[in-house]
């Protein structure tokens, strides 16, 4: 069953309504699945270029520092052993690939669960536009955002073609801008409220709603994998 949401103007008035498709905005949120998808997304952003040198890679230390017996000291074979300052590192980090395989169906299910959670909490808004006219105005954008929500962190979903709104919003602190095609679970969850422009909302709904492989819930096998 679809839910309707008021479309608000920059001054807070109502300018019609939009229908929220149930298969996108009214599904059961799978916390374990959302966690897995977010962890995978953050892991994909890691460079994995960290590296340390072992005692065999550190320069120097090729000569035995002193003879084996007769000095009263513990025997040593190299000044580049781990116990020495400037020596090699034991079991230190080495370059690796942190990326995890995340099926597209799981990403879609996690995103829909996150959006549904925001709708149920009254933290998703649809607006007609951000600023009027063709001239960007950060002041107008700030006033409009505070009219729609008092949340500390706000995710605004708008098309890159909405250049005036994009330029007006991009300098606002704690306001994150994203194109509908790039909307993801992490950005929805890390921000308190989600604000769609009407044009971006229509584009987002038209996209995933057409895909036959885009499901509102993960399969039982995927859910079991997420819970492990």
Curated annotation (Swiss-Prot):
GO terms for cellular component: ribonucleoprotein complex; ribosome. Keywords: Ribonucleoprotein, Ribosomal protein, RNA-binding, rRNA-binding. Residues 45-102, 208-228 are annotated as: Disordered. Residues 208-221 have a biased composition (Low complexity). GO terms for biological process: translation. One of its GO terms (molecular function) is structural constituent of ribosome. Gene3D superfamilies: 3.40.1370.10. Belongs to the universal ribosomal protein uL4 family. Part of the 50S ribosomal subunit. One of the primary rRNA binding proteins, this protein initially binds near the 5'-end of the 23S rRNA. It is important during the early stages of 50S assembly. It makes multiple contacts with different domains of the 23S rRNA in the assembled 50S subunit and ribosome. This is Large ribosomal subunit protein uL4. It comes from Saccharopolyspora erythraea (strain ATCC 11635 / DSM 40517 / JCM 4748 / NBRC 13426 / NCIMB 8594 / NRRL 2338). The gene is rplD.
């Amino acid at each position: 069953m679809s839910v309707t949401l008021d479309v608000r103007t920059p001054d807070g008035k109502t300018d019609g309504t939009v229908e929220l498709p149930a298969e996108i905005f009214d599904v059961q949120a799978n916390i374990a699945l959302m966690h897995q998808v977010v962890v995978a997304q953050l892991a994909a952003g890691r460079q994995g270029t960290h590296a340390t040198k072992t005692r065999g890679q550190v320069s120097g230390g090729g000569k035995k520092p002193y003879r084996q017996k007769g000095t009263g000291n513990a025997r040593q074979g190299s000044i580049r052993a781990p116990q020495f300052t400037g020596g090699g590192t034991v079991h230190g980090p080495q370059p690796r690939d942190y990326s995890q395989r995340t099926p597209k169906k799981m990403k879609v299910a996690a995103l829909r669960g996150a959006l549904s959670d925001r709708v149920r909490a009254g933290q998703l808004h649809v607006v007609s536009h951000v600023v009027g006219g063709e001239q960007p105005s950060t002041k107008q954008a700030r006033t409009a955002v505070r009219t729609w929500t008092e949340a500390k962190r706000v995710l605004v979903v708008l098309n890159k073609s909405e250049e005036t709104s994009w330029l007006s919003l991009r300098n606002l602190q704690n306001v994150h801008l994203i194109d509908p095609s790039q909307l993801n679970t992490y950005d929805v969850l890390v921000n308190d409220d989600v604000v769609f422009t009407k044009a971006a909302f229509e584009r987002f709904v038209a996209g995933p709603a057409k895909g036959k492989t885009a499901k509102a819930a993960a399969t039982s096998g995927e859910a079991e994998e997420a819970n492990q």
